[in-house]
Amino acid sequence: MTQTDYPAPFWPTRQISEEQAAFIEEAADEKAEAVAAERGQYVKIASVARAMPEHRYSQESITAAFKAYWLAQLRSPERLDQFHSRVGVDHRHLAFPMERYQEFASFGETNAAWLQAAEQLGAQAIDAALDRAGLSRPDLHALFVVSVTGIASPSLDARLINRLRLRPDIKRTPIFGIGCAGGAIGLTRAADYVLAYPHHNAAILAVELCSLTIQPDDLSPANLIAVGLFADGAAAAIVSGAKTGHPSTASRAPVREGPRILGTGSVFYPDSEDIMGWDISEKGMKIVLSPRLPELIRKNLAGDVDAFLARNGLRRSDIGAWVMHPGGPKVLNAIQDTLQLEDGALDRSWDCLKRFGNLSSASVLLVLEEVQMNHAPEPGTYGVLLAMGPGFCAEMILLRW
C-alpha cells in the first residue's frame, strides 16, 4: 500500500498521555520567566517593520482582471467571484502594476523580477526595523533572509549586504522552502543566534512576491484560491541579545521596544508533504494547497500548543496575546476553534488578512508589528506567535511584553 492509498488524514493525531497531562498540570504552577532565566533565554525583539510595494489594488479590481484574462477558459466566471469573496481580503499590494504581469513569458523572467523587487523591499524593511530599534547598519551582526517565491545565487542576503554596505564580518543565513512558517522560523533562528552571542543584534527579513508565482494557465481550485489570497510585501525584525543596548551598541532610543522571547518550539507532522508547498517545473512554482489543512490543525494544534506552554510553565489561559499567521479564513477559524480562543483574540490576524492578504512568510511579522505598534499588550502579558508551513510543520514562540 502506498502513502496515497491511506484514507485522509494519514498523519498521526497527537494524543496526550496521562504522564504528559500530569506534567502539563505540574509545570503550569511554575513561572515561565523563571524557567527562561534558568535557561538564559532572555532575548528581545527590539523592533519589527514592514515594507510594501507602491502598487495597491482592491480585491474587486484584481478579480476583474483575472476574469478578463481567463474569459475564454472559465466555464463559470461567478466561481472566481465566489472564491475571491470568501478569503477575507479587501486590498493587496503587488510588486508591479497589474498590466505588467502579462509581459512575463517564462520562469526566468518572473524570477529576475522577483530578485529586483525583493532586494528593494528587503532593504527598505531592514532599514525601517533598524531605525525603530534605535540602531544603525554597523550594529547588525547577523542576517537571516527568508523567501519562498524566488531563488538566487549569490542569494538575496548577499545582495542586501552589498546594497546596504553591512559589516563585512556579518553572519548570513538564507532560508528557502518553509513558506508561511518562515517568519516564525526566522525569528527562532535569530533568537538562537543572539543566545550564543548576547552582545549581538540579528535581523530576520521575510520578503515574498507571491504574485510572481501565479500560473496563468492553471485553473485548478488551489490556484484560483491562491490568486485571490496571496500578495506581496516584506517585513523585518531586529532580535537583540541580553547584553546589547549599552552606548557603544545603541545609537539612539528605540521607538517602542518589543517583547522578550522566553521560549521557542517546533512541531513536524510526519508524512504530510502534500499539505502545502510548490510543484516546481520549467513554468515556475505551482501552488500545492490541500483542503485537508484545517482538519490537521483541528486534530493536532491544541495538544501541541499545550505541550509547548507546559514546558514553559504556562497554560492557554495565561496567554493574553495571540500573534497568528493569517493563512486564510479556514485556517484562522480552525485555530480559533481548536484553541477555544475568545472572540476577538485573533482580530489582529484578521485585520492584516483584510488589509494585505496572505504574504506567506512575512505575514506573521506584519501581525506582530500591528500588535506592537498599535495594540501593545500591558507589561507582563504573555503572548504566543505561531505560524505553519510546508513540511508540514508549526513554529511557536513564547513572548512576554
Regions found by a protein language model. Name each.
Residues 39-42, 137-141, 168-171, 197-202, ...:
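Short coil/turn connectors at secondary-structure junctions
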